[in-house]
Amino acid sequence: MQAVTAAAAAGQLLTDTRRGPRCRARLGTTRLSWTGRFAVEAFAGQCQSSATTVMHKFSAISQAARPRRNTKRQCSDDYPALQAGCSEVNWDQNGSNANRLEEIRGDVLKKLRSFYEFCRPHTIFGTIIGITSVSLLPMKSIDDFTVTVLRGYLEALTAALCMNIYVVGLNQLYDIQIDKINKPGLPLASGEFSVATGVFLVLAFLIMSFSIGIRSGSAPLMCALIVSFLLGSAYSIEAPFLRWKRHALLAASCILFVRAILVQLAFFAHMQQHVLKRPLAATKSLVFATLFMCCFSAVIALFKDIPDVDGDRDFGIQSLSVRLGPQRVYQLCISILLTAYGAATLVGASSTNLFQKIITVSGHGLLALTLWQRAQHFEVENQARVTSFYMFIWKLFYAEYFLIPFVQ
């Protein structure tokens, strides 16, 4: 734009420059008079005015054509108000971008936290620890820990986790109204996730679980996934002959069969038979794990309904806590766990290996003592303490899987 303006001004300059000789020619050829429009003084004044105009235009052209250096400094010296305005605009734009990025970051973190709650992390941790512990039982020496074994373990774990998310997600989809009373912080009950989002997540993880199982080619793993799918669906889906969670015995049976029997037997067989290519044979630790986890899974199935008694009663869920009352169910759960720990201590004492005997006896004794002390401060009317105690039972569940490999 400056180049075009300079060219136009240069053309005008040439035109005005040519007017100088015309003025002189007219001065020599025109008859002069001392009065009137063509007086010498007036004519000379016009020529002088034209010359002055030419000089000003030439100066303007030179200024426009001259390259600007240190534009920032010139803007600062000549136009301080303009530079202040530019700085303010830049600051506003940077601040707006930073705020927008912070909002996006906050939204992403919020969605991740909601997804974390959607997965029911205490069940995820239980699945990870349980499958890891059971997968170690067939190992006889350090030579068994190979890349093939690691791949087989990861296939089983990933497929099981995807199925776990399907089961807990499906339960939340059918329990939205109940969870608004019992667990209002869950993403579907709170409205953080829409029903469409929940359906998408449930179907996606179901497909991933079966895809991994089929790709592995493991019959025990596929058996575990299919049974988990069937029982998890029957537990939650509202349909004739389904929605087994309405009935205390059927609900407890679903949880007990999956957590106590299926996890131990199916994943042990997967590692022993499919991965290590050894004949399937039960071990002392496998039998102990199955029997002990039957007791523990029954406790989890019964105790989980104590915090939910209000919502279950309102929606016709006939859990044992609704029928017998939370206090009686709580006392039953504590009795079952203490009995199981006593039996585990006797099993550990029968071990021929001194180190394993010390670990199993002292470990189960310490867990039983911790449970008894914690039970002294339990208040069934205090919702916060009931929920906290339920999560404490899950921690005992995790701890037991660390002791199971030492039972030989």
From Swiss-Prot:
Expressed in seeds. GO terms for molecular function: homogentisate geranylgeranyltransferase activity. It is a multi-pass membrane protein. InterPro entries: AtHST-like, UbiA_prenyltransferase, UbiA_sf. Its main location: plastid. It is found in: Plastid, Chloroplast membrane. Belongs to the UbiA prenyltransferase family. This is Homogentisate geranylgeranyltransferase. The lineage of its organism: Eukaryota, Viridiplantae, Streptophyta, Embryophyta, Tracheophyta. The gene is HGGT.
